[in-house]
A protein has these predicted regions:
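Bacterial Sec-exported substrate-binding components of ABC uptake systems
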Residues: 2-8, 19-62, 161-180
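Hydrophobic core
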Residues: 12-16
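Extracytoplasmic/periplasmic mature domains of Sec-exported, cell-envelope-associated bacterial proteins
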Residues: 37-40, 44-47, 75-76, 113-116, ...
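Early extracytoplasmic/lumenal segment of secretory-pathway proteins
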Residues: 40-48, 95-107, 123
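Extracytoplasmic substrate-binding proteins
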Residues: 45-48, 123-180
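A short helix->loop->beta-strand "cap" motif at the edges of active sites that frequently abuts
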Residues: 54, 72, 131-134
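Extracytoplasmic/periplasmic, Sec-exported soluble proteins
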Residues: 55-59, 98-101, 109, 116-120, ...
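A short, structured surface patch at a secondary-structure boundary
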Residues: 58-109, 113-118
């Protein structure tokens, strides 16, 4: 009887505490409602993508390399005077500078997903949502968060293996530099 109680107590503890730690995986297929993907963004909002996005706009140029790393395509992007831009995205329509997004141009592109920076674009979330546009706001601050966002981009574009590979490649590049 003591063994049974110990096993029962351990199972109960595992059940209770499994939801207490940080969520390493912020996305999941939404099987219960047949959605493509459910994402918890960096604002804590749950965003349900009913199907794989086909018309993505990035409001932060820093995310373009992540999107490019998984072979993702965009229909619009913010412009910036700093940073390298992937060649495939140089001729994509612009929706204004990162800090001055032209919402009319953005909405006119009819995106099914907007990838925004939490700090810069959180104020736009209600307007985008009222226009039935799915939007995630992210803000990776650490190396591990950057890798998590690479993996997220792979999931968004329906190629999770490319997101995992991009994160692994980043690890290899960092390792090569730090071992010198």
């Amino acid at each position: 009887m003591k063994i049974f109680r110990a096993v029962l107590a351990a199972a109960l503890c595992l059940t209770v505490f499994s939801g207490c730690g940080p969520n390493a995986e912020n996305t999941k297929p939404a099987n219960d409602d047949k959605a493509f993907l459910t994402i918890t963004d960096d604002t804590g909002r749950t965003v349900v993508l009913p199907e794989k996005p086909e018309r993505v706009v990035s409001l932060a140029t820093s995310y373009l390399n992540m999107i490019d790393a998984v072979g993702g395509k965009i229909v619009g992007r913010a412009s910036s005077k700093i940073g390298e831009m992937p060649e495939a995205m140089k001729n994509v329509p612009e929706v204004g500078f990162v800090y001055n997004i032209n919402m009319e141009s953005l909405i006119g592109l009819k995106p099914d997903l907007v990838i925004a920076n939490k700090n810069q674009h959180e104020k736009f979330l209600p307007l985008l949502e009222s226009n039935k546009i799915h939007v995630i706001a992210i803000n990776p601050k650490t190396y591990d968060e950057v890798k998590d966002k690479l993996i997220l981009m792979g999931k968004i574009y329906g190629v999770p293996e490319k997101g995992e590979a991009a994160a692994a490649k980043l690890d290899q590049q960092v390792k090569a530099v730090t071992e010198k």
